[in-house]
Amino acid sequence: MGKKDYWVVWRINIDSTVSRSNGRVVPRQLAVDKPTLEEIAKAASMLGLKYEAHPEKKHPRHWFEEDYVGCIYVYKVDDYSRRSLIKKLAQIVKSSRRGG
């Protein structure tokens, strides 16, 4: 898998407890509190996307904090930009937490 073949989606990208300057990508209304890697992977699976989970990877800006461990590599598809993909993943995680 070459570097250009996938987007990296970090747990921190959809975490409502994190500021945008520290790595959150989506608006706070779409973000969820402390998302798990499993929730994000399940959302990617629900969208029918190919991905690889990497639970040991640490966010580069927060390599020393255990709260920010884990990311998934999502293979690129023409239907999404990285930002729109992360928004869609956040929506799915948020709705699954509500039970819907």
UniProtKB/Swiss-Prot annotation:
GO function terms (MF aspect): 7S RNA binding
Cytoplasm recorded as keyword: yes
Q: Does the keyword Transmembrane helix apply?
A: no
The places in or outside the cell where this protein is found are: Cytoplasm
Q: Which domain of life is it from?
A: Archaea
Query: SUPFAM superfamilies from the xrefs?
Result: SRP19
- Read off the Pfam families from this record: SRP19
Q: Write out the transmembrane intervals.
A: none
GO BP annotations, alphabetical order? SRP-dependent cotranslational protein targeting to membrane, signal sequence recognition
Alphabetic keyword roster: Cytoplasm, Ribonucleoprotein, RNA-binding, Signal recognition particle
**Annotated signal peptide:** none
> Entry's InterPro entries?
Signal_recog_particle_SRP19, SRP19-like_sf, SRP19_arc-type
Q: What does this protein do?
A: Involved in targeting and insertion of nascent membrane proteins into the cytoplasmic membrane. Binds directly to 7S RNA and mediates binding of the 54 kDa subunit of the SRP.
Describe the protein's quaternary organization and the partners it interacts with: Part of the signal recognition particle protein translocation system, which is composed of SRP and FtsY. Archaeal SRP consists of a 7S RNA molecule of 300 nucleotides and two protein subunits: SRP54 and SRP19.
Alphabetical list of HAMAP family matching this protein: SRP19 (MF_00305)
Q: Which family does it belong to?
A: Belongs to the SRP19 family.
Descriptive protein name: Signal recognition particle 19 kDa protein
This protein's species is Caldivirga maquilingensis (strain ATCC 700844 / DSM 13496 / JCM 10307 / IC-167)
